[in-house]
Amino acid sequence: MTTFYDYYKSKIVKKLMMELNYSSIMQVPKIDKITLNMGVGAASSDKKVLDNAVLDLTAISGQKPLITKARKSVAGFKIRQGYPIGCKVTLRGKRKWDFFERLIVIAIPRIRDFRGLSTNSFDGKGNYSLGIREQIIFPEIDYDKIDRVRGLDITITTTANSDHEARLLLSSFNFPFRK
């Protein structure tokens, strides 16, 4: 499949079984899915902004995003129920592993003034979320062709029962946590 998946199967599963005292391979936590979300506040006034965000997310993820719509009207933000306000992609299978590898090996090292990712971003159930301020850290995005720099949220959903297990899993992939 991919090098990260092969590495997970051959090395990480055995290592985590020993560390967590599991008797079955099925108990070992794994990455279930990766969700990319790009909220576009200016989409309510200009439809072209949302189209460009969809193109960026398509290039980053390799699959067509789902356009998210406002659940309720908010007068302060000038949006009404049903207005398109962003886009999201859920990655599973081979695309999940390909993206995860590109995120760790290529994208995160390109973040300006990077000092490691916070360990406080776990949700209590073993899932990790991080925010990217600039989509240009991904090599698929051509800096000269983007209309504006926009960020995105990345959520890594795992089958881990606790934050400790999820941190062990992600650290096994050399995920750059802050010391």
Swiss-Prot record:
Note the PROSITE patterns from the entry. RIBOSOMAL_L5
Designated gene of the protein: rplE
The job of this chain, per UniProt, is described as: This is one of the proteins that bind and probably mediate the attachment of the 5S RNA into the large ribosomal subunit, where it forms part of the central protuberance. In the 70S ribosome it contacts protein S13 of the 30S subunit (bridge B1b), connecting the 2 subunits; this bridge is implicated in subunit movement. Contacts the P site tRNA; the 5S rRNA and some of its associated proteins might help stabilize positioning of ribosome-bound tRNAs.
Q: Which Pfam families does this chain map to? A: Ribosomal_L5, Ribosomal_L5_C
Any idea which UniProt keywords this protein has? Answer: Ribonucleoprotein, Ribosomal protein, RNA-binding, rRNA-binding, tRNA-binding
GO function term, MF aspect, one = rRNA binding
Q: Which GO terms describe its cellular component?
A: ribonucleoprotein complex; ribosome
Subunit details: Part of the 50S ribosomal subunit; part of the 5S rRNA/L5/L18/L25 subcomplex. Contacts the 5S rRNA and the P site tRNA. Forms a bridge to the 30S subunit in the 70S ribosome.
The record's section on PANTHER family has: 60S RIBOSOMAL PROTEIN L11-RELATED (PTHR11994)
**Which biological process, per GO, is one annotated for this protein?**
translation
The family line of this record is:
Belongs to the universal ribosomal protein uL5 family.
For this protein, the record's SUPFAM superfamilies field holds: RL5-like (SSF55282)
Its recorded name reads Large ribosomal subunit protein uL5
**Origin species:** Buchnera aphidicola subsp. Schizaphis graminum (strain Sg)
Which superkingdom does the taxonomy of this entry point to? Bacteria
